[in-house]
Amino acid sequence: MLATSAAEPLALLRQYWGHQQFRPGQQEIMEAVLAGHDALALLPTGGGKSVCFQVPALARPGICVVVSPLIALMRDQVENLRKRGLKAEAVYAGMSHQEIDQALDNCVYSKEIKFLYVSPERLLTDLFRARVARMNVGLLAIDEAHCLSQWGYDFRPPYLRIAELRALLPATVPCIALTATATGQVRQDIVEKLNFRPGYGIFTQSFARPKLSYSVLHTEDKFRRLLEVLRGVGPGKTGIVYARTRRQAEDTAAWLVQQKLPAAAYHAGLPPEQRTRVQQAWLADKIRIIVATNAFGMGIDKPDVRVVAHLDAPATLEAYYQEAGRAGRDGLYAFAVLLSGPADADSLRRQATLAHPPADVVRRVYQALANYSRTAVGGGELVAFDFDLGLFAETYRLKAVDTHHALKALEQQGFVQVTEAVNQPARVQLISNQQDLYQFQVANAQHDLLIKALLRLYGGELFVAFQPISEGALSRHLRQSTTDVVRQLRYLHSAGVLHYQPKRELPQALFTTPRYDAPQLPLDERRLQAARQLTEQQTAAVIEYAASTSRCRQQLLLNYFAEPDALACGVCDVCLAHKKARQAPPDTARLQAGLLELLRATPLLPRQVVARYPTAEAPTIASALRTLVELGQLAYAADGRLSVGATKA
């Protein structure tokens, strides 16, 4: 166990992040981890989850192994750590065996590397198991921990093997799991699946966003209402519009430009360079509105987004909460607007049905994937390959929708994995020593110019580790075609002079087990049925949220995330309508005084307070309680009860 004063984490925060204080709840989480306890941290979107494991990782000896499901998010966090002067490595699909080997070696032998990010399917390969056993691991962090639970909205079977990883580590290594979206059932699942040890803590912050106004606008003309919303937040304010399909994103962005609103589309089908340009222009406020599919937003840090609008409801409230929560992270008032049409509920139900194709379709897609990747029965485990969904479906005459959902089913059963699109530059490492390289150049004059160009443009670091290169830059330097440069690099790779990894732009797919003969694929029919039932429940929750005209929007969301005592927010469309409808509100000062007198005598849960008044006054009582909390006259205790004055959590 490491004895660490509270001052040390704060000093690290100030030194590397430049923040003067922790956000609410962060310090308690860190203290538990630094005391050697397991911890589950449930923080709202934008609540500073990464700091909760990064700071303790620096305060503890050894390296922090971070399990993360998204390549883009992993790479962003590694890049951000390196910018802060902290050393980090990452291992994920699309890297060569040599790159993975080198990254893991660095973590074994370098005491300066503090973070190793790893995608879940890489955790228990023979290579990883052998190397992690030799690492001085000080902390295990599980990002997006809801992926552990089959009841979560993004279940990923490789996460279930994290418990096996824990068995390889000393018992003194604590585990911290973090998520922004977890129902009560998912929380229990996380604790059990990670084998949390006695003394563990669950740290929850309310998912409430007091200054985020949730609204549902029922309309037959979504474009017109969208325009009203975007103009209504004020000139120059930035926003995100979420569309269901790539085509819808492009059409909506084009229409907004016609209406004199600076907008651009963003989706996974665009070339990586274009996606980067659009994202950077939006971050720099050169584009006001970004119209995106759900491929956009994860890991994006733009606190001044004033509005997030959805043209259609997402499939789950978890997804909606995360996407809507990208508005107003600066703590100022912001808006989350869902546009709902007359046929939307029926459309959601149809999509829920389509989301679970029959087993014979799933097997057919599995066989097609084997043909596409030319993978023999018994082979291909964890060998990544470029994957173009459109081309794949067209080649094997599959319906794109069925194919997408069949791949999801195969992922949830633990047979395949498809990553998001990656934009990874070509990489090279010289593996000949300088004397052997010189002799090769003398004997192979036709490759001498390319080798000299590599050394001139990228330096001696090429002998030490993989370095990103540009085939285009080499082409211009040598005045040769890019095709010729790539051909030479491939030859030098095959000749054992260097390791060459070509540029990757497409999503990566891989088999997470040795490939089965499709008819013998051991699909678990019970799990397929359970997944159907879960989707039906999630769809019903979204439909209820959109249809409600009597319950506070934020209260509905918080109840879904196991906050039964949540107060009405006072700023959503439903709460504002209730305020407007009340003709004769009670004397506010007298009501507040009565509540203070009541709670001074006996701390109570909010629902217990509300229950003491007539049902018709419930919204008024909830509003008064919220006001007293905001004024600091009431405070929450650790058990959720309200009492007068400051209370220790």
Q: Where do the protein language model's features map onto the residues?
A:
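Helicase motor core with emphasis on the C-terminal RecA-like subdomain
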Residues: L2-A3, A7-Y16, Q20-P24, E28-L40, ...
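Residue-level signal for tight coil/turn positions that link beta-strands
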Residues: P61, R209, R504, A638-D639
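N-terminal/domain-start segments enriched in small and hydrophobic, helix-friendly residues
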Residues: V137, I142, C147-S149, L591-L598, ...
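C-terminal accessory/connector segments of nucleic-acid motor ATPases
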Residues: P357-R515, Q520-A624, Q633-Y636, S643-V644
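Short, amphipathic C-terminal "tail helix"
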Residues: E630, G645-K648
